[in-house]
Amino acid sequence: MNATAQALVLPFITQVTRAVSLSENVKVLGGIPFAEDGTYLEWLSILGFTIGCYYVIYTFYALCFHPLRKYPGPWHLAVSNIPNRWSTISGNSSYWLYDLHEKYGPIVRVAPNEISYSDPQAWQDIYGPQPNQRLGMPKDPKFFSSFEDKKTAASIITSQPKDYMRMRHIYSYGFSKQVMLAKEEMIQGIIDRAMEALRQTKQQPQDIVQIFRATDFSIVTEIVFGKAYHIFDRPTYQPWFKSLMGWIRSTAVITATTDYPLGKLAAWLLTPRSVLKQRNVYLKYVNGEIEERIGESNAGRKDVVQLMFETTDQPKLAESDIRANLPFMVIAASETTTTLMSGMIAHLLNSPDALSQLTAEVRGRFRSPSDITIATVNNLPFLNACVNEALRVYPAAPTQLPRVVPGEGATVCNRWVPGGTKVYVAPYATFRSAENFYQPDAFLPQRWLPENGESFDVDKKNAWRPFGLGAHECPGQVITNLITRLIMCKLLLSFDLELCADSQDWLSRQPVWIVWDKPELLIKARPAAA
């Protein structure tokens, strides 16, 4: 249809230009040629009429002849992707997709050339290995390139399969349990400092989201750069960690405008100035730290940067690879962990029975904070169930990650999809679907226990993929799971928690810009009785 549009419209543009140039009565008003005899307006009207006809024809084509015409969904989404993109810009995309799936079912056409799924089978069909696509379907290049701020090298997000596997090997090891064990003393020290900061509040309301964020950020920067920034004690770095959401939100807007001409300009105009300022603050700090770390010795650092320099994989990673990857990796590792812990504690504080059961499990297992280690926190069944349930009702990464169907086409959920179609699983809609889970909107950790009862037999556990599936599964999930368990155990062992009245509706309709835009979660922490 693009060729058709050109064939219809371009001749009229030429005629308008010619008519104006041939007119003997042309005046220039404000730099615009204007024919006094009305020729210019006449041809301009014809041009407008032609463009209108084109869109009428395109609408007819999209509804009646497009290869996706038989897929369910509202008609207006079949002719325009603007509603879809606006849902991202406005922070409403996860709820918007949820509502569509509730109305139209597990497969919905959400744009002229775009399909969203909440069917568990779609995880495997889209993201899982295929005979001719071992990394799953190709990533949507426009969407994922939006995460890159440096263009000197492709990051792990947009790299080709061979380079991707090489980078993934490094990052998976850098965020592995083995590395965390080597740095456990440092990690425990940061968490203990957070607990001490909470103790010093003397039971006054505190924003637990910011405490989690400062803790996670300090741990991740130690793992990545080989030094912790100790946000609680070094105010110099507080603007850096407080700017994380600015980078995330502005990136979300960029992903929504890449399909349009002048997309970057549109993103700049549609992003609040305060958010753009935060983005610049984040990039200033992180790029400064990257340059400083590159200039330092690798001896004894045992951080991700050292791993990148010393990898035996060929070809070796260059400084440009470090600059391309680390701005995103710092956020991906820290903010998803903060999101998981914030959602988990909010649901626990709104579920007294679950909170009581988890607190009893933690205090029954550990006698002092020193007993809580990386080696011991995984052996708590109800804690594991609470983490899993938090990831279901409040996924750390609720945003859809689009793939593009290969040119030869593919079968997704037993239906043929033509090549070039953008496809994805909508995580929030999938995890909250009654087709996939019993009482999907309730926080019920017991669904993940072996003795969960017959009610949960209907649960489709294969629908639950909080960190993705296949070769592109999140390499930082190990660190997210371990940090969450360490902090939750120390928090519940040391304090009795109370949700403040101002945060009773904290879980209500939070905006989503890649991750949840988390408001203050005010709690009171009373030291637990010895």
UniProtKB/Swiss-Prot annotation:
Cofactor(s) the protein requires to work: heme
CDD domains cross-referenced by the UniProt entry: CYP60B-like
Pfam family, any one: p450
Protein name, per record: Cytochrome P450 monooxygenase aneG
Glycosylation sites: 2, 92
Entry's transmembrane regions: 43-63
One GO molecular-function entry: oxidoreductase activity, acting on paired donors, with incorporation or reduction of molecular oxygen
Signal peptide from the UniProt entry: none
Species per Swiss-Prot/TrEMBL record: Aspergillus aculeatus (strain ATCC 16872 / CBS 172.66 / WB 5094)
Family affiliation: Belongs to the cytochrome P450 family.
The protein's annotated pathway: Secondary metabolite biosynthesis
Residues binding heme: 474
Effect of deleting the gene: Abolishes the formation of aculene A and accumulates a major product,asperculane A, along with two minor products, asperculane C and 14-prolyl asperculane C.
Record's keyword terms, sorted: Glycoprotein, Heme, Iron, Membrane, Metal-binding, Monooxygenase, Oxidoreductase, Transmembrane, Transmembrane helix
Keyword Protein biosynthesis tagged: no
Enzyme class: oxidoreductase
PANTHER family: CYTOCHROME P450 (PTHR24305), CYTOCHROME P450 MONOOXYGENASE ASQL-RELATED (PTHR24305:SF210)
Enzymatic reactions: asperaculane E + reduced [NADPH--hemoprotein reductase] + O2 = asperaculane G + oxidized [NADPH--hemoprotein reductase] + H2O + H(+); asperaculane G + reduced [NADPH--hemoprotein reductase] + O2 = aculene D + oxidized [NADPH--hemoprotein reductase] + CO2 + 2 H2O; asperaculane E + 2 reduced [NADPH--hemoprotein reductase] + 2 O2 = aculene D + 2 oxidized [NADPH--hemoprotein reductase] + CO2 + 3 H2O + H(+)
Heme among keywords: yes
Membrane-related topology note: Single-pass membrane protein
Gene this protein is translated from: aneG
GO BP terms in the entry: biosynthetic process
E.C. code: 1.-.-.-
Domain of life of the native organism: Eukaryota
